Amino acid sequence: MRLCDTDIEKHLDEGIITISPRPDNGKINGATIDLRLGNSFRVFREHSAPYIDVSGPKEAVAEQLERVMSDEIIVADNEAFFLHPGVLALATTLESVKLPADIIGWLDGRSSLARLGLMVHVTAHRIDPGWEGKIVLEFYNSGKLPLALRPNMIIGALSFEVLSGPAARPYNSRQDAKYKNQQSAVASRINQDR
């Protein structure tokens, strides 16, 4: 069952779901809460590798990932990050989110931004039960013009669904959780898959 606006408020008020900084209640819609864009970005360095062998030896994959991903780019609140057509970039939400073991989150992009060609997540829109940290966004500009994205703009909407019971293996308790407590645009850690 998805939480409605009054249940989202109640879960925030009671500390069952934590979002920091907490958006004001005006950012809570019928079944979602708006999240804003943070300051942390990463991009792919062009022509730094002919390909990424995502199923190759872990050490080789780690080396390729290090070569192709930029260092963290911090964009000031009053500046813009330009996402050009056909480019994939990573960014974070401004807010940090903490979910209990019996609630899963779903991040959706905004229709108004999608109509300009912006995809907020390429495939990863599930926020696991037990998650804690900022949400990394996988931006892709499928439009024809560069898009200027500014920190603090509303970038997506998060909804919450109550599970049939608490997860036995919530994200924050797993030893293999690769993105636990992430606070920046963390690059892929596919080389850490088991």
Swiss-Prot record:
UniProt key word Membrane: no
Keywords on record: Hydrolase, Nucleotide metabolism, Nucleotide-binding
GO biological process, one term: dUTP biosynthetic process
Top-level taxon of the source organism: Bacteria
EC number: 3.5.4.13
Active site: E138 (proton donor/acceptor)
Comp. bias regions, Polar residues: 180-194
Subunit structure: Homotrimer.
Job description of the protein: Catalyzes the deamination of dCTP to dUTP.
Protein name: dCTP deaminase
Gene name of the record: dcd
